[in-house]
């Protein structure tokens, strides 16, 4: 069984994939993330507040991906090789220091690719249900904050 922080961190990747599916590639750049216990915040560069319908769809798609129990693959690769395989989309707005030569790249197939050195669950099903609690658009900075929490796992093993 994974710690709640590992599950919540893994949920960031699932939520991010849903955000990009619903809002488009304009929302692909992560500005910041935050995890504490079962609560997480994903902050992306974006130019507007999503509609209530879009927010519901992000939550629905994220939970669909959790139910799918998709594998979360981790590749540990030389930086140059990772950049050839995954391109700039694996990066966030906060840069990976230049002296880091080996990258861990988290891949949820056809959903999310991200250079990330944190621990993750092996599948999306191990994350548990995701509930979006608050969405805040900071117009002056062009940032969209998505606050979510993990609900209890239905069948913890």
UniProtKB/Swiss-Prot annotation:
Superkingdom to which the source organism belongs: Archaea
The record's comment on protein family reads:
Belongs to the class-II aminoacyl-tRNA synthetase family. Editing domain AlaX-S subfamily.
Protein name, UniProt field? Alanyl-tRNA editing protein AlaX-S
Gene Ontology biological process terms in this record: tRNA aminoacylation
Q: By its UniProt entry, which InterPro entries does this protein fall under?
A: Alanyl-tRNA_Editing_Enzymes (IPR051335), Thr/Ala-tRNA-synth_IIc_edit (IPR018163), tRNA_SAD (IPR012947)
The entry's free-text remark on the cofactor is: Binds 1 zinc ion per subunit; the homodimer seems not to bind zinc. The zinc is probably not catalytic. Another report suggests the zinc is catalytic.
Describe the subunit structure: Monomer and homodimer; the dimer is less active in tRNA editing and does not have a zinc ion associated with it. Another report shows only a monomeric form.
- Pfam families given for it? tRNA_SAD
> Gene3D superfamilies annotated for this entry?
Threonyl-trna Synthetase, Chain A, domain 2
Species this protein is from: Pyrococcus horikoshii (strain ATCC 700860 / DSM 12428 / JCM 9974 / NBRC 100139 / OT-3)
Subcellular location, record wording? Cytoplasm
Q: State how changing residue 30 to V affects the protein, per the record.
A: Significant deacylation of correctly charged L-alanyl-tRNA(Ala) occurs
Q: Name one GO molecular function term.
A: ATP binding
For the ligand (Zn(2+)), the binding residues are 9, 13, 116, 120
